[in-house]
Curated annotation (Swiss-Prot):
Entry protein name: Acetylcholine receptor subunit alpha-type acr-5
InterPro entries named among the record's database cross-references: Neur_chan_lig-bd, Neur_chan_lig-bd_sf, Neur_channel, Neuro-gated_channel_TM_sf, Neuro_actylchol_rec, Neurotrans-gated_channel_TM, Neurotransmitter_ion_chnl_CS
Positions in the Cytoplasmic compartment: 345-356, 413-563
Family membership: Belongs to the ligand-gated ion channel (TC 1.A.9) family. Acetylcholine receptor (TC 1.A.9.1) subfamily.
Amino acid sequence: MLPNIILILLIRYCSCGAGSRVYEKYGKQVQLSPATTSSYREWYDSNREHSTRNNTNVDDFQTQLKKSLENTTAAYNATFMQELIEERQRYLEKLNEGQFINDQRRLVEELLDPNYYEKTVHPKRDYTRPTRVNLSMSLYQILDVDEHMQSIEVNVWMVQHWYDEFLDWNPVDYGMINRTIVPYHQIWIPDTYLYNSEELEQKKTESLMNAQLETGHWNQKKDGAKVQLMFPAIYKLSCRMDVRWFPYDRQNCTFIISSWTHDKQTIDYWPLSSTVNLGNMARNDEWEVISFEFVRVEETFKCCTAPWVMLYAHLVIRRKPLYYMINLVVPTSIITIVAVTGFFTPTSSSSERDEKLYLGINTLLTMSVMMLMVCNQMPSTSTYVPLMSWYYIGIIMVIVVGTFLATGVLAIHGQKHYNKPISDRIRKLIYNPVVEFFILSPPTSLIDLWTEFGVISEQRHSTHLDPLLLQHMDPISHTTRADPQHFFGSISSQMCDLQSTYSYTARLATITRQYTQHAKMKALRKNQYRMSMDTSQARGVKKQKMQRRCSLEWEFLANVLDRILLTIFCGFTFAVFIILIGFDSFFTFHTDSPPKTM
């Protein structure tokens, strides 16, 4: 046997290459011959490779080792075999007691040994050097956006990684293990906190699990092991809602992420990427994500001299307006148009016009209920009025003004009972070709009355001549017809002569009849009395026609006003509806965000 030849006992071989610390902890020095050492090493290496390929467990390997030792006992001298058997018995006892485990468990136990590692200590051997924490985030789902409470709730996946110089190891000493998993509460982790979270207890929002360690032995920088902490979180954070353009609003909800106790001299936060991962996000039917970007800002507070590194994650979302268009805007516009049409539909009776007032009151009640539904979703702020509220205010004003104007038209319609004709100016306004073509034509009965009473201009009358005058008129020559001046002059002169002759003949005949019919004076008086009776009947008929004319004039004026107001209000309502439907296409606006500094 050669001196100073040290062989790690069977425990080192069974642990598959443990480091010096394990040897110091469990090992023992023995002196073996070169032949013995070489033979046992060859046997161990061959059986170790065989057991590794065949995934042999510890019990099978123990049985093989026991059988091999029994077979080789006779080949060695009694002294060495006695020592080997004793060492084998001690190994079997410790193996049965569970003191020898696989490489991964041994690695974890040694890394987290309280005598070697302290989780409250900064993970840098030089404490003056800050620990760089790289942070990334993936948005999984937008759970809720509460405009009234001005908060948003999201489901995100957080990833933080940094380097810990006290957790590094050599993979050669641990079966080439480059990565392992350890409980998060047994290592140092940064106190990353969401500043604007509505939940103060972090355990209720973050589900921390295990941390992943990756050796830094192969890294040339020698920064230590890479620690990666991945966990899901449900954050409910306060978000100032800007709903002035509701339902076309865009919201910018900012995540303020930083350490609560460490400034830049201890922890330096950096975003792993400038944008948040949206690849795994579940679709939201109400909101559309426009952007989700990280911004790194160094801020100085009054409490501390050193700056604090803050990570701002700006989540910009846009509301999908289809739901509100279908359930609020379209029904409101239809109700308004129906109400306006009912207000200003021409009617002839007063009872029908009275129903318009009840229609206006019912429509106002409907608008108030629908506006209340919108107000329940809006934040209680006096800074601005949402676009949807302006829409309902405008619609309510249309209904109110329409109701008042319908009352005015009703009052105009009631003037027909006073038998007072309308003024000539108003008559000229409502009876002209423009109004007749674009708005409303007067009824035929009213035109006949206007013609009978001479209201319509003389150009609309036909000139009728007495047949006796036409019989005594001389024919007009073709030469006179060719010259318009002589034509009208000839007619005028003949008319004057004939009228003079006709008047003289008529007066002479009247005097002759008076003298010749003196005997019939009594009958004549009877005839005069009968004619006076006919005249009073004619006056009554004329009065009735005058009343009819006044009634038709006021009704026609009310109908013209109804038609004009109907066109104006329907056009206004339709224009507001089109503007609101296409508001997002007609107008563009931007959501404010803090300055981007890195």
